[in-house]
Each structure stands twice: as C-alpha cells, then as structure tokens.
Amino acid sequence: MTEIYDFDKSAWDIKGPIAPIQPTTYSDGRLVPQVRVIDPGLGDRKDECSMYMFLLGVVEDSDPLGPPIGRAFGSLPLGVGRSTAKPEKLLKEATELDIVVRRTAGLNEKLVFYNNTPLTLLTPWRKVLTTGSVFNANQVCNAVNLIPLDTPQRFRVVYMSITRLSDNGYYTVPRRMLEFRSVNAVAFNLLVTLRIDKAIGPGKIIDNTEQLPEATFMVHIGNFRRKKSEVYSADYCKMKIEKMGLVFALGGIGGTSLHIRSTGKMSKTLHAQLGFKKTLCYPLMDINEDLNRLLWRSRCKIVRIQAVLQPSVPQEFRIYDDVIINDDQGLFKVL
C-alpha cells in the first residue's frame, strides 16, 4: 500500500528555481558562449571557492578545412575544483579547449573525451580534461546515434554551468544503498514535480506560467525498519519525516540535481544508511537521464515535493540485470 505525504512549499521556496540559459547567436549563426552560476546551499562552508563545473556544447566534425558540421548537443561534467577566478574567465578558457570526442561501447554506448590544450585557470579540473574521461553516452549526449565513427569529432564548448558548493559538504548516497531492500521495511521515496520553461529566446514572455509543462522524478532516500518482524505504520513514518526538517534546492551537479538538507532529527537507522550525512545530492544524470538532458538549458523550478511511503521491494524479486539469454534454448532465463 502506498501512502503520500505533501511537504510545505516553504521547504524549497528559496532555492527551488534554476534560471535558464537563453540562447543568443552571432551574425553568422554561432551560439554566443554563456556561463550560469547556481548556489543551492545555505552558505555554512568556510571555504567559498569550491565549485562543480559542467560544460555544454556541440559535438561536431573536426575538419580544419571547412565549416564544422554539428552532429549532436552534448555535455562534459568536469567535477569539483577550487578556484577564485571569475566565471567569465573560466568560460573563456573553456571555449578555447581542443576536446576530442570518440564514440565507443562497453556494457552500453560510451563517449570518450580528452583535451589537447594546456590548462591555466582550469588546472583544478585537470584530472578529467588531461587524463580523459568516459561516460555513458545517453547521459552526456542527446543524439549519440548521429555521431559518426569514420570522421574525427570534437566537443566545442558553448555554455558553462557552475554550482557553488557553499554548504558544508554534499554527499552522494552510494548506489548499493539506493538498491538496498529489506524485509518488513517501509521505503521512503520522494516524488518531485518540476515546472519546465524551455529557453525560448530573449524578450519572449510566457503569460500563464501555470500552463508550462511539468515533469516528475523519484528518488529513494532510505528505509524505515524495525528491529522486530513488525512494520512501522505510515503515520509513524510521516512523524519521523516531519522531525527531519528537510529543506530542498536545485543545483547543477551533472546537469540538474536535487539537494536535500536535514535541519532536524533523523532516525539512527536512516542516518546510518545515508553514511551519517545530513546534506545529500541526487544528480538527475543518474536518476533520470532523459529528463536531465531536457533540463540542460531550461528554466525549471520545484512546484511540489511529496514523500512516498511504500513497502520495500522483497529481496526475492529479480531485477533486470538477473535476466540473461539461455544459450541452449534461445530463451530468456531468470537466474
């Protein structure tokens, strides 16, 4: 049985929206580079120069003899670095990078990125830029099927998104814990509703924001579980959630991310599941890659957050990764 509990909008009023990147072009049609700075935190970190950097751009043919042919729109997450440089100067250096892109495959399709340009201001992000990086193609590209293999490709940076890490630490919940299932436990999930306003160009105004499209995504926080074989009631779980004093914000980790901070009391079991952290980060890049790509340049804001209490999925249930093809019979087989 599923129970739903609505959070008061005051829990996300301050840091709920993200401003869009409005596309503007030069006279020849090329996009004008822009930078966006997001601060989803409350400002209690002593070191104010830590930031997460995320690049957006065009995957195009690397042909010095003619005008480049754009193949797809892509992104390159650079991760966390420390810098006191102005965002505009960081953007300028990023647009001068010579980033090579290569399409390959592993468990799924991949994109490989590596940079051939010496770094100065972007040195704090050298591990990704100099050493190279590989990503799930669907997480960082909107149309990987259009990227050819027989023509060298480059990633031309157009936009930069910087997320200032002003909170005293963000914690990404380990994947094993997110997949943890327990007998007689109540799963605590969040259903987040976003209102999306795509970048439609400068000077254009949406008269009725209520008519803008909405999208939802769901994240798993943890499980409420009693030591005995009994199950907590929904009302008791709701009381525990209210005591946590959750505050929500949107950031730019991996594109768009949900940031959660507990300002109250958290149950010992749940606190342990979350690595004894009270400031959490859930990148949509990992949760819902399709929605994340849609939000790369869009204005969006939180309009509703609901706690969803559900029975934990039984451990005997098989997940998709446990299904293989039986070579003997040519049929799907559940291990």
From Swiss-Prot:
GO annotations under biological process? virion assembly
- InterPro entries per UniProt: Matrix_C (IPR042539), Matrix_N (IPR042540), Matrix_Paramyxo_C (IPR055413), Matrix_Paramyxo_N (IPR000982)
Any matching Pfam family: Matrix_Paramyxo_C
Determine if Membrane is one of this entry's keywords: yes
Q: Which cysteines are joined by disulfide bonds?
A: none
Q: What subunit structure does UniProt give?
A: Homodimer. Dimerization is critical for virion formation. Interacts with host ANP32B.
What this chain does, per the entry, is described as: The M protein has a crucial role in virus assembly and interacts with the RNP complex as well as with the viral membrane. Associates with phosphatidylserine (PS) and phosphatidylinositol 4,5-bisphosphate (PIP2) at the plasma membrane. Interaction with PIP2 triggers matrix protein lattice polymerization. Matrix proteins induce host membrane deformation and curvature necessary for virion assembly/budding.
Protein's recorded name: Matrix protein
Tell me which species this is from: Measles virus (strain Halle)
Q: What is the organism lineage in this UniProt record?
A: Viruses, Riboviria, Orthornavirae, Negarnaviricota, Haploviricotina
